[in-house]
A protein has these predicted regions:
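Short pre-active-site segment immediately N-terminal to the catalytic Zn-binding motif
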Residues: 80, 183-205
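Sec-dependent signal peptide cleavage junction
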Residues: 16-30, 34
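Active-site recognition of the HExxH zinc-binding catalytic motif
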Residues: 202-218
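Conserved "repeat-terminator" motif of extracellular CCP/Sushi domains
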Residues: 432-440, 488-512
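Aromatic sugar-binding surface patches on proteins
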Residues: 378-397
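Surface-exposed interfaces of beta-sheet-rich extracellular modules
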Residues: 25, 463-489
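Propeptide-to-catalytic entry region of secreted or membrane-anchored zinc metalloproteases
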Residues: 31-159, 417-419
Length: 513
């Protein structure tokens, strides 16, 4: 939800009159109720507030780091904050493309302590919180130096806590309020509340998509974002290479002069999946080399097979009107049949892809149609010009005939250099399995216990595939091994559990490494 922070800035002077003057006290003067020390664990003393691992699958320098900071949570409410943060983060990671990149995202929670519970609201209550977040209408934003405090904590994390050389990609401030609030201030800061519509992390997923992906709200009048446009011209519209693919077309946004790619998207309606345009741009930014040292080389949108249809019309996401599968394959008789995807190069080197499309008879041996194409995808030489490294790939079989029930289709996108199959015509419907990563402390007597500062991390991988262990380090601990006798784990069932083992880092040993 893009919020109008210019309007918020206009009323800051009013907010100053509402919020008590002592709210702006320096960090060192923060009152801690009943004299309890914030840093309960020796390993946490290197940071102002304790840091909790919500989700960590790999090195912070290799993964995109998201930090959740709480506002309006008192010392007594820190368990609630951790529960809320974990709940929202886990929910967010069930939405594509966060889901596909769950092995490439690390999430931490900073337990900032507020003197009072809740958040301030313009024209209403005034609450003494650490970041001084206030609500104005449905929007949230910092007041009274909250921005500087959050930036200081970010610098502290980068210098003292995260794996060496890592940077925080974005900060999400979770507010202790049941109000339906949300906002994205810029690429660094976004906000949500502990509201009913955010119980599964939907608001967090939406707001962080603003910050990470630079995406706009598709119900607004603004046209300066990758998923909004001021033109309907199919040659010049920003998503021209995706027109006609998986429901992407041209539809009205918030006004008659603003346009969006889809009627069904998280950036228009909470609870809807991201459209293909938004998924691709969000995936690209999750692999920004300013924050990620080992980016995924290429993004391949889930391929589809379809018969001819309007490229500028906007279809419902799950429309079967033009999409062809093995269930309705006879519908393609006497029509052109297209196997298509759109790819985005995410690194500064050429990618070589091979596209194959076959139709095999119901007998399992007769090949009725077979086509192959090779593509060279230009390097992403300019981060700010992703279109130059984006291509629509397609094989069209003209005027097919003789298709019968039981015929099979086989479409593949293959890395021509390695032979790896990157996607197929079945990718969109693939089942997912969960790899649950547990973090345990191994004591001198050989017994183990859960590491209290780390939640179980759930990584999503395609069913019947493999997962490569990455042996992540944890601040204050030294990694010593896992319960797996191999580095690559077969994922055959719904869930696979892997336990990483650690020892408390010896005094004087710098962690993480």
């Amino acid at each position: 939800m893009k919020k109008q922070f210019q309007a918020l800035l206009l009323i800051i002077s009013i907010l100053f009159s509402i919020i008590p003057q002592d709210v702006a006290r320096a960090d060192a003067d923060l009152v801690q109720p009943r004299g309890t020390t914030v840093a309960q664990n020796e390993t946490m003393q290197k940071t102002t507030f304790p840091v909790h691992v919500i989700h960590k699958a790999g090195d912070d320098k290799e993964n995109f780091v998201i930090v959740i900071m709480g506002d309006g949570y008192t010392l007594e409410e820190q368990d609630k904050f951790l529960q809320d943060a974990a709940e929202k983060a886990r929910g967010m990671l069930t939405w594509s493309p966060y889901k596909e990149y769950s092995d490439r995202i690390n999430i931490y929670a900073v337990q900032a302590v507020s003197n009072e519970s809740g958040i301030s609201e313009y024209g209403g209550k005034s609450v003494d919180t650490y970041f001084h977040v206030a609500a104005y209408g449905k929007a949230l934003g910092f007041t009274s130096g909250g921005t500087d405090k959050a930036k200081a904590l970010r610098a502290e994390l980068e210098e003292r806590y995260l794996d060496a050389g890592a940077n925080v990609g974005t900060i999400h401030v979770l507010c202790n309020s049941e109000g339906s609030f949300g906002a994205s201030q810029n690429s660094l800061f976004s906000f949500s509340a502990n509201s009913e519509d955010n119980q599964n992390g939907t608001v967090m997923a939406h707001e962080i998509a603003h910050s990470i992906g630079g995406l706009g709200d598709e119900y607004e009048r603004y046209t300066n974002k990758p998923n909004t446009s001021d033109t309907t011209n199919p040659e010049t519209i920003k998503w021209a290479k995706m027109l006609g693919f998986r429901g992407i077309g041209v539809t009205q946004a918030g006004t008659e002069t603003a346009f969006a790619p889809s009627r069904e998207c998280m950036m228009r309606w909470l609870g809807q999946p991201f459209c293909e345009v938004c998924k691709m741009e969000l995936a690209r930014n999750l692999n920004n080399t300013d924050y990620v040292s080992r980016p995924v080389a290429i993004y391949v949108a889930d391929p589809e097979i379809s018969i001819p249809h309007s490229k500028t019309g906007t279809l419902d996401r799950d429309s079967e009107k033009y999409r062809i599968s093995e269930k309705n394959i006879t519908k393609a008789n006497n029509r052109d049949l297209e196997f298509r995807t759109v790819v985005q190069n995410m690194v500064n080197r050429e990618q070589h892809l091979k596209m194959t499309f076959r139709i095999i008879g119901a007998d399992g041996t007769t090949v009725k149609y077979s086509e192959e194409k090779k593509y060279t995808i230009p390097a992403l030489a300019n981060w700010y010009d992703p279109e130059a490294a984006k291509e629509s790939l397609s094989i069209t079989i003209p005027d097919v005939s003789g298709l019968v029930s039981g015929d099979k289709m086989e479409g593949k996108i293959v890395d021509a250099d390695t032979g790896e199959v990157l996607a197929t015509d079945k990718t969109a419907e693939q089942a997912w399995s969960m790899v649950n990563l547990h973090y345990k402390l191994k004591k001198e007597d050989g017994t183990t216990e859960d590491i209290p500062e780390a939640e179980t991390t759930t990584v999503y991988v395609p069913a019947n595939s493999t997962y490569t262990l990455r042996n992540p380090q944890l601040a204050g601990y030294s990694y010593i091994g896992s319960d797996s006798d191999r580095n690559v784990v077969n994922v055959a069932g719904e869930n696979v559990d892997v336990t990483y083992y650690y020892q408390v880092a010896a005094e004087g040993v710098e962690t993480p490494k």
